[in-house]
């Protein structure tokens, strides 16, 4: 499976060292093992999970510097927060989901892999925004969570003055961006060029929508 992962990473333009891939594959195996007991994901096939969970989550990694403070909203079983943290260990990551059992799993993974600078917290984003500094995060990510309009409303108070929202979308990403154009301008953000890609096994279409605060906001 190590060679398989390396091959697929190459096909999305990403290269990771063997120890990093080993940790990613351990996480994948552990997620599928726990899934038999507590229903973390609807995907049970390892090859499918490799592509649609692990590889999909890693598509965002080339957009990250590696030293940022990142919030992952609605992270579920730790997607994309845990693959991001494994691939970019210098990042400080807060992973948030409202489902307690999924956070328990993430905390287990963090302990086993000794992920320093990673916190998994069971709460709603709305309550988080009341307790965190308004300029806390360099990056907010969300994978297949909700409409871009809602994502921007949730992320805006949690991003610093150079912060970015990275919304991991399917083929509807471009349409959602167009629908939110006025809201984006009013909030003081600008959209970076869309990144379209296809997952290498299924051909499933993905769109990375990146919204960045305008300078001086």
Curated annotation (Swiss-Prot):
Protein's cellular compartments: Cytoplasm
Listed EC numbers: 2.1.1.170
Transmembrane segments: none
Domain of life the protein comes from: Bacteria
UniProt-annotated binding residues for S-adenosyl-L-methionine: 74, 79, 125-126, 143
UniProt keyword Cell cycle present: no
Catalytic activity: guanosine(527) in 16S rRNA + S-adenosyl-L-methionine = N(7)-methylguanosine(527) in 16S rRNA + S-adenosyl-L-homocysteine
Catalytic class of the enzyme: transferase
PANTHER family: S-ADENOSYL-L-METHIONINE-DEPENDENT METHYLTRANSFERASES SUPERFAMILY PROTEIN
Protein name per Swiss-Prot or TrEMBL: Ribosomal RNA small subunit methyltransferase G
